[in-house]
Amino acid sequence: MTVTSTIHVVAALIRDQAGRVLLVRKRGTAAFMQPGGKRDAGEDDVTALAREIDEELGCRMVSGSARPLGEFEAVAANEPGRRVKAAVYGIDVNGEIAPQAEIDEMIWVDPLAPPNIVLAPLTRDHVLPLAAADQA
């Protein structure tokens, strides 16, 4: 299959007190990934990320907490034939984190020892190794 286009998204690396990373699985999909999504018209990365965190997790991104971690590209997990390019930010959140909207499930994983679950290529190949290197 030929990869035809790239989807541009923002993604959040959220850690708990133990250093575990939050992953979510969207309804009707198999792969776990970072919370986040596509920018709406006129949004910058941080505004889009704050909106996505509110929509997906029901909590608020702490103002000024977004730390750019890099841009990464991989095969898209949920859109066959496409790639995803993500601007990844480490963020802090306020409030209780709970699946909302299209999120079916969320888990906290140790980036040094991720569980045997289906991971989005971007998460598996870039984000968890980045988080593990930062934690080691």
Predicted regions and their residues:
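The catalytic Nudix box helix
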Residues: 35-69
